[in-house]
Amino acid sequence: MIRLLAFLVGIFFAGLLLLSFFVNLTGFITDPPAPTAETAGFHQEPKELHLASNGPLGKYDRQQVQRGFQVYKEVCSACHSLKLVAFRDLRQLGYTDAEVKAIANQWATEVPSINPETGEPASRKALPADHFPSPYPNETAARAGNNNALPPDLSLMTKAREGGAPYVYSLLTGYAKQEGYRNEEGKELLKEFPDAVTPKGLHFNPYFANLNIAMPPPLVADGQVSYADGTKSTVDQNAKDVAAFLVWTAEPKLETRHGVGLVVLIFLLIATVLAYMSYTAIWAEAKRQVAPVGPLDPDNMEKRAEARVDAGIAGGPEPGAGH
């Protein structure tokens, strides 16, 4: 009785779910949701970005990543932190110990500390062992200085956002004037969606998910960053370089991982060749040397032939032949 009751209850809920599904499906077909600016082709996919670190055998372009660090230092660090990266990690980019120490000591934001005499909160110059400090003391201060938007930490940005480095590059170079903006089909945004006007305090960017982003354009003009290596500084170059730097912050062991992967592939290839050679040299020969056993054994076939002769059916077909 209990099983029957449980079965009926299950049937009831299953039927209820099916009914709800068909009702919603019918409503979706008869009254589909209205298109939005994001779904009508005004949101753009990230542009292509070719970096030296791309691909299964990619390696970092140390000069480009150093330029990207310079862009982060002079532009991005005013709002964004790198909590998972230590100053001493910069040695992987080719900086010497003395240069790393100088970078840490001259960093604009000091590291939170405690006054050893009074026990009160204090700050000190950064050391190579310290992680990059946040430019804000807390989340409330960060939101207060950015129109209530919290600037995200950039340590893992290229892994946390779909599109990775191309998304970062496209976002930084994608700010545009909303008035007169058209999609690839030639449709004008504000004519198709008059209510899509960018709210006050936000900035139009077709590469952002909802087209409006709180971050103002960080790269506004060519020459904004003067590269130490003499590379021509343009907005496009700045965006590419800082995207390459953020790939490194997210995957500092990328080159090691690629190297280990290559070694493993070579090992598997050699092991496969050796296994095939062992098969052809040992097992295939051993297989040919195994004597047949059973009805096809030559001795058994000879005995059957003699038995047919003794039975007077010599020359007749083998038993079962033709079946």
Language model: regions and residue ranges:
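The canonical Cys-X-X-Cys-His
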Residues: 72-83, 242, 246
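Membrane-proximal low-complexity regions enriched in glycine and acidic/polar residues
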Residues: 111-213
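Electrostatic cytochrome c docking/interface patches
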Residues: 44-70, 81-100, 230, 250-258
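Extended, hydrophilic extramembrane loops/domains of integral membrane proteins
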Residues: 207-251
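Selective detector of the "anchor" transmembrane alpha-helix that sits immediately C-terminal
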Residues: 258-283
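Acidic/histidine-rich catalytic neighborhood
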Residues: 55, 64, 85-86, 92-93, ...
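Post-cleavage N-terminal segment of exported redox proteins
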Residues: 1-59, 275-293, 297, 301
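Cytoplasmic C-terminal tails of single-pass
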Residues: 288-323
